[in-house]
């Protein structure tokens, strides 16, 4: 399967990175995060999430393996046992996070706990797409050289994740005070 999305009425497959300065803004006074994505970005994210849900349920796409890393690198039998024990729980957690994102995608602000579900989904999407693009931790993108829509999407998800971490940082400060 391939990632797809469309914006606008012309039906063309395209992707536009949002012009908004910060996609998320932490509100420590309310223990919430403000979602500042424009409608097109929310539509793109929602479309990706729907495709991701289908991929998870189908469970045949090899790029999903990045979401379930092996616990035992040198013992496939132990790793299979571990996978049998945890796979269904991990899948359930991912599907529940998708549910949260889908239910809150159009809200202006969400509770921090719901935002952590957003972060999990965005990170999972980034990992799966990165696997498909054969991206490694050593890779650096030259923004002037990105012509592939999937690369643009990967970078956008990485930026969203970075901004999500920054926006939720106040929760770590509160945690460290206790």
PLM features per residue range, with description:
Residues 16-90, 100-104, 108-110, 114-117, ...:
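Charged, alpha-helix-forming regions
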Residues 4-6, 119, 157:
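Short linear interaction motif-like sites in intrinsically disordered regions of transcription factors
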Residues 97:
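Long, charged, mostly alpha-helical binding arms that flank functional sites
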Residues 1-16:
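N-terminal amphipathic/basic-hydrophobic helices that include classical n-h-c signal peptides
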């Amino acid at each position: 399967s391939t990632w797809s999305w469309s914006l606008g009425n012309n039906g063309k497959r395209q992707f536009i990175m949002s012009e908004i300065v910060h996609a998320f803004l932490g509100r420590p006074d309310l223990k919430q995060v403000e979602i500042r994505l424009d409608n097109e970005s929310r539509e793109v994210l929602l479309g990706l999430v729907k495709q991701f849900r289908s991929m998870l349920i189908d469970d045949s796409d090899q790029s999903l393996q990045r979401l379930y890393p092996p616990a035992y690198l040198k013992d496939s039998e132990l790793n299979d046992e571990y996978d049998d024990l945890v796979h269904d729980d991990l899948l359930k957690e991912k599907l529940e996070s998708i549910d949260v994102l889908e239910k809150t995608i159009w809200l202006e602000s969400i509770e921090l706990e719901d935002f952590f579900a957003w972060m999990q989904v965005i990170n999972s999407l980034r990992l799966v797409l990165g696997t498909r693009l054969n991206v490694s931790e050593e890779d650096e993108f030259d923004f002037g050289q990105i012509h592939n829509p999937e690369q643009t999407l990967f970078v956008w998800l990485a930026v969203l994740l970075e901004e999500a971490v920054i926006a939720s940082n106040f929760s770590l400060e509160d945690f460290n005070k206790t």
